Amino acid sequence: MRKFIQTIQNIWKIEDLRSRLLTTLLFVLIYRFGSFVVLPGINPSALNALQAQTEGGLMALLDMFSGGAFSNASIFALGIMPYISASIVIQLLTIAVPYFQKMQKEGESGRQKMNQITRYLTVAILLFQGPSYLVNLSVQMAQAGQSVAVGFNWFTISSTILLCAGSMFVMWLGERITDRGIGNGISFIILIGIIARFPQAIIQEFGSRLNEGGGLMVFILEIILLLAVFAFAILLVQGTRRIPVQYAKRMVGNKQYGGVRQYIPLKVNAANVMPIIFAQAIMFIPIALAGFSSSEANAFTRAFMDNNGFWYNAVFALLIIVFTYFYTAIIINPVQMAENLKLNNGFIPGVKPGKKTAEYIDTIMTRLTLPGSCLLAIIAVLPAFARFFGVSMSFAQFFGGTSLLIMVGVILDTLQQIESKLLERHYDGFYESGMRIKGRSAMAY
């Protein structure tokens, strides 16, 4: 505890770090305030139907990422997800399309062009998602006894503009946090949205256990299990297999370079949360089509509408394993890694440079991906197991899935950046032993 207090004091002593933390706090407060500003023409008291719809599935994920703005019909309802969707599309195009590959190699100018294209694509996605959200909102409001006229009218046009402007403003806040605050701004906004739901979830679970059964001991056991799941997620995020690399000695004038041994850190979960996001998007398709299909098809889709059911989670876990292999194969290029080693006079001891090195790295990644994908699938379905044992829906979401991995990853990245600022000013880090915090970026090749 003394070490922790001393670290906080050191953080406050550094003017730049103190300024960044206060700036981050200011932007977070602005974001949270906007999450409660309801769209004009919407009666906030009639939003219970929409909030009930977001208790499970992809809707719950969107609502959690937006910190409740989605179910509040806020001007920030669409949140940062359209920008993330656009970024994922551009990332995939960078791998598959030569034009984007060339742009990526242009350095800072290429990065600025790709950022601009990402923003344009974000606007296009918002122009589609805005009216779609309003149609869904009108259906849910009708169930609550309040009509919302959605069509080519002033309400739809003005609300779509507000939703698009709100989402772009959230994106701007994220970029400002990255530039002037602490951590990656976009990831930090998602983290805030997730954490904002935690106090309400834990109070609801506490009240449920006291009133409906289980008592205080069961609640304490749930907290202990939650901490254990967090520790497990940290191990999954930070787990790496280090491949030793030797660099050949070379003489430049009278000086000798090379001859040192380094490591290539290959992550157990190189794909991070992307397989879960892809799998959830696929699992949402039958639910979205349920209203347009026959009664026989609806009977089939009902099995997938229950995200606590066996078939939903079995298919969900299988899709995560498949997408983990798929996405890892996209982002990890053993041939390129072997070529880079060869160009820098590096080699893996006992392995011939070139093709043999690429095959060796590919074999290691294949062996790592199998346990990594299975562990990722287990984390993804843990909320369903929690629900099976009587944990409330809102609290069960913190036992696994995308939200847990994002929380762990962003917190580690933010703490690593704070620790780096401390070390730059010759202060100690968070640990007395000298151990350093490793974020996700520190383990990328």
Cite the ranges covered by each PLM segment.
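N-terminal cationic and glycine-rich segments that engage phosphates or anionic surfaces
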Residues: 1-104, 109-445
